[in-house]
């Protein structure tokens, strides 16, 4: 396993451990409510598994099969960091159970994505979603805010397989319920954080970008909770602006102070939203697609309509990476 991948596992496991320890150290009254549906004893068991996995990283044995010493599939480690053996040593019953979970995850993910795009004055929208071999937690959707403006969201649930897909379904249901109840992204994020705080401590976290556009006045109001920064092309100034996170991802901090920002947009402006499946994809030399390549692409193709822009971006990404290891989700919004 390469060093960068190992560091990602180590950081994720450490964050997971720290959140559990924080909960265990809280006063006893707060533990009367099961933690993500788990009792204190169950959380202790999960914490022990996390510590063992981190120990294996320190010892240099994480990801190695205990039976043959070979490398365990990275995708399976993302599904379950406690995995000790490679697929070659799974029983036929274990393999069938794994395949059933993965197929169900694919079905859940497919059914969650919107069947059609909003038709709006002054706005063009195009989207693309492709699942990797091991289904992850990418999600995008649209909603109408309380004051009648167009809302949109792109998110990534950290994790793989059925747990990520099921959490994604909860996220969809919550957003479709909360979106019409509030006027700003920060209000929606605050409620989402309240709803997901306990469950997320066992699924790690959700990075999410929520935007609401006043299509008549071309005003964008947004909040970015730990998601990769969308790229905004300012057609008037011919400049790029990165919409960096306004707060951490949901589930990483206790009682975050969510913020919203407002941008006046104009005709020809483009907003590109994406998940890490794009920028972290690697070519045969191990080079990531990266944000800088994405910025260069946006500048070069800013004169295209959203469909042409999306098609060209997909082709460019596929030339760079033959097989994506993570889900790939893209959303392009252009002001007419």
Where do the model's predicted regions map?
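… and, occasionally, acidic/histidine-rich disordered N-termini of signaling adaptors
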Residues: 94-270, 323-336
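Short metal-coordination and nucleic-acid-contact micro-motifs, chiefly zinc-binding Cys/His arrays
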Residues: 58-62, 82
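Cys/His-rich microdomains that often coordinate metals
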Residues: 72, 93
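Short, cysteine/histidine-rich loop/knuckle motifs that typically chelate Zn2+
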Residues: 66-68, 88
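Interaction interfaces in information-processing and related assembly proteins
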Residues: 1-59
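Active-site-proximal, acidic helix/loop segment immediately C-terminal to a metal-coordinating Asp/Glu
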Residues: 163-181, 241, 265, 269-321
């Amino acid at each position: 396993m390469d060093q960068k991948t190992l560091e990602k596992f180590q950081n994720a496991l450490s964050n997971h451990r720290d959140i559990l320890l924080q909960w265990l150290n809280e006063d006893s009254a707060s533990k009367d409510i099961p933690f993500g549906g788990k009792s204190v004893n169950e959380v202790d068991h999960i914490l022990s598994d996390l510590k063992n996995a981190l120990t294996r990283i320190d010892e240099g044995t994480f990801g190695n099969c205990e039976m043959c010493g070979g490398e365990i599939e990275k995708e399976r480690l993302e599904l379950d960091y406690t995995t000790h053996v490679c697929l070659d040593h799974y029983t036929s019953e274990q393999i069938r159970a794994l395949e059933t979970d993965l197929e169900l995850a694919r079905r859940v993910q497919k059914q969650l994505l919107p069947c059609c795009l909003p038709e709006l004055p002054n706005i063009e929208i195009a989207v693309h979603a492709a699942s990797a071999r091991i289904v992850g937690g990418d999600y995008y959707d649209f909603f109408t805010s309380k004051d009648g403006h167009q809302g949109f969201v792109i998110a990534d649930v950290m994790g793989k397989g059925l747990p990520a897909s099921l959490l994604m379904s909860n996220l969809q249901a919550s957003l479709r319920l909360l979106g019409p109840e509030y006027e700003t992204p920060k209000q929606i994020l605050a409620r989402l954080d309240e709803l997901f705080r306990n469950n997320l401590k066992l699924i790690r976290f959700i990075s999410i970008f929520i935007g609401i556009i006043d299509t008549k006045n071309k005003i964008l109001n947004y909040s970015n909770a730990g998601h990769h920064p969308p790229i905004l092309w300012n057609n008037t100034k011919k400049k790029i602006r990165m919409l960096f996170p306004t707060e951490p991802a949901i589930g990483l901090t206790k009682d975050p102070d969510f913020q919203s920002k407002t941008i006046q947009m104009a005709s020809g402006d483009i907003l590109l939203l994406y998940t890490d499946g794009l920028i972290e994809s690697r070519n045969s030399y191990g080079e990531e697609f990266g944000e800088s390549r994405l910025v260069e692409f946006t500048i070069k193709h800013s004169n295209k309509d959203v469909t042409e822009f999306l098609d060209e971006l997909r082709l460019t990404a596929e030339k760079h990476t033959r097989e994506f290891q993570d889900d790939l989700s893209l959303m392009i919004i252009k002001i007419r």
